[in-house]
């Protein structure tokens, strides 16, 4: 389920940027995994990645001191 509000996403990470980066990284991983399958599109991967972040399957680590973050 995709949340209807960005407030829900801000409960997951400390910024919208962190959520976008995490979702993009996960979508890229998924698209590489399903690269051979023509039934999957990138938009499907982004939706799936967002769903995984919202449901806690992908954890967004807090920022490090140097400003980088782990997904």
From Swiss-Prot:
Example of a GO MF term: DNA binding
Pfam families reported in the protein's UniProt record: RNA_pol_Rpb6
InterPro entries: DNA-dir_RNA_pol_omega (IPR003716), Pol_omega/Rpo6/RPB6 (IPR006110), RPB6/omega-like_sf (IPR036161)
Keyword Nucleotidyltransferase: yes
Alphabetical list of SMART domains matching this protein: RNA_pol_Rpb6
GO cellular component: DNA-directed RNA polymerase complex
Disulfides per UniProt: none
Gene Ontology biological process terms from the UniProt entry: DNA-templated transcription
Keyword Transferase appears in the UniProt entry: yes
Family, per entry: Belongs to the RNA polymerase subunit omega family.
Self-association state and partner proteins as the record states: The RNAP catalytic core consists of 2 alpha, 1 beta, 1 beta' and 1 omega subunit. When a sigma factor is associated with the core the holoenzyme is formed, which can initiate transcription.
Name listed for the protein in its UniProt record: DNA-directed RNA polymerase subunit omega
């Amino acid at each position: 389920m995709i949340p209807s509000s960005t407030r829900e996403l801000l409960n997951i990470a400390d910024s919208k940027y962190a959520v976008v980066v995490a979702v993009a990284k996960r979508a890229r991983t998924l698209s590489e995994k399903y690269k051979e399958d023509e039934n999957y599109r990138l938009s499907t991967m982004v939706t799936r990645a967002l769903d995984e972040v919202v449901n806690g399957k992908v954890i967004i680590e807090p920022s490090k001191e140097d400003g980088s973050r782990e997904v």
